[in-house]
């Protein structure tokens, strides 16, 4: 199955972007070539940019506190697996503690490190990190891969709590919904939301339907899923086939 996700608000959109960037950082940091570690470092800059646009730390703490209260209330329910519930609450409490221990905003990493600031200012220029522009960075790229990796991990350490909080919130959100089989008749599907508020929509497609691309949109009244198909380099075009898929609407 291939999964497409659509956030209903800017807060969830930001968390999804951070999740994607952290995954990219992991991948390129696990490689060995200097160019791959260059991508890891520029990805770290992107994470700092996204995380610095809003007070994510406060938002995450508030959401985790809200989830802890809701889950704690379930301890009186004998039908709930108390061991699993305690594990989830423990994870949430650990995330809150880690976030409370962090000092400053994500962008503080750049303002405190002039060398990283100089690399970032050149990295946004096409071809701006050549050896004649940043000889010190060029020399760093020729250090052993283990040293480069250790440096990037050190620079990313202030973001560990933010990543843990983001991961926990998104996991709880994704687990909050139930999937249902629907069909996009003539390539299009729409559903009234009947006043219910959602934060995330998921579309699960069978691998055999990989050629069909869902374009999703929603407002507080209705959601739409319109399937398109792309031929070569041409723009995606609408399709009129009946396409089955799994739809999941998630909300805390």
Swiss-Prot record:
One Gene Ontology term from the biological process aspect of the record: FtsZ-dependent cytokinesis
InterPro entries in alphabetical order: ZapD, ZapD_C, ZapD_sf
Entry keywords, A to Z: Cell cycle, Cell division, Cytoplasm, Septation
Membrane-spanning residues: none
SUPFAM superfamilies in UniProt: YacF-like (SSF160950)
Pfam families (alphabetical): ZapD (PF07072)
GO cellular component: cell division site; cytoplasm
Subcellular location: Cytoplasm
Similarity comment text for this entry: Belongs to the ZapD family.
Subunit structure: Interacts with FtsZ.
Primary role: Cell division factor that enhances FtsZ-ring assembly. Directly interacts with FtsZ and promotes bundling of FtsZ protofilaments, with a reduction in FtsZ GTPase activity.
Protein's recorded name: Cell division protein ZapD
UniProt organism field: Cupriavidus pinatubonensis (strain JMP 134 / LMG 1197) (Cupriavidus necator (strain JMP 134))
